[in-house]
Amino acid sequence: GKGSTGRYLTQLLENLNYKIGHYTSPHIFSFNERFYLDGKIANDEELEQAHIRLEEIFKQDLQKLSYFEYATFLAMILFQKCDFIVLEAGVGGEYDATSVFERRMNIFTRIGFDHIQILGNSLEDIARTKLKVMAPIALISDEQEQNVLNLAKKIAFLKKANLQVSSLNPFLKETFEIYCKKFVLPCFLKHNLKLALKACEILTSQEKTLEALKKLQELNLQGRCQEISPNFFVDVGHNPMAAKAMIDKFQGEKINLIYNAYLDKDIFQILNTLKPIIDTIQIYKYKSVERKLADDEIYSIASKLGIQCKEFV
């Protein structure tokens, strides 16, 4: 939910005439998609100028940055003149490149099992790693396990942070429901919009948030349950929570799933969650240089789950 929550907040603040930069990941079709500035995706020339500036700053050390670190610094160069910068974390928490910057506010979407090889093997370990970077003002999704909420409150107390749990202001309820009905939002996008509205309210006021919501257009973000042609959806979800969101969206239907994932993802749990709505899995084979894809593993798991599986051609 990080991407859509961040983009909703970005669009809300844009509606109040703020200059906003939004950094997100992953991208679908073009690297440029990660950089949203002034209501549009950054163009090649803007990225090239930002890259030249980074080379001037880092010199030879630029080669030492990871892919995500490089992209994060590129975003900060691009967004220098913005009123607000919305940074989407990668793995999240103390090991994330976005955490090195001073923050006005943190937003914690629902915390689940992802990046366990970096963040920890238990939900509490993962949550602790993410919540350690809590800013003086923080907002956390109310869709958390109780032990995660308890931990968040404990860390907020120790850091003397102002932590709020997301809820929809009754002042916004009618306009919110009209918007959700107009754009037929699935459950997960409704929840992420609520979170963004609360963040906007914290940053501005309830009156300004209502004004922004009344002007809000459809979510402008690639790959978040995005219908790119009739009955053809693209989604970047890559963990069990995202799979559950897809179950809610396509409940009672059968889909042909064109799929692949990195080998370090919880593929069994993802496909097991999606099983009730899958007719066939088609594996999209893509050459990945840095991280191994799970082609053979998907065949094996699909066989165990009794799901028909073949190569996408």
Which residues does each predicted region cover?
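Conserved catalytic-core segment of NTP-binding enzymes
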Residues: 90-94, 102-160, 269
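Walker A (P-loop) phosphate-binding motif
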Residues: 1-28, 105-107
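Nucleotide phosphate-binding/pyrophosphate-handling subdomain across enzymes
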Residues: 84-89, 96-107, 111-115, 125, ...
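ATP-dependent carboxylate-amine ligase catalytic core
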Residues: 15-101, 117-119, 146
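C-terminal helical cap/extension that packs against the catalytic core
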Residues: 143-164, 168, 172-173, 271-313
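Beta-strand->loop->alpha-helix junctions that form or flank phosphate-binding loops
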Residues: 23-25, 140-144, 155-173, 185-187, ...
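Hydrophobic alpha-helical packing residues
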Residues: 9-17, 79, 203, 274, ...
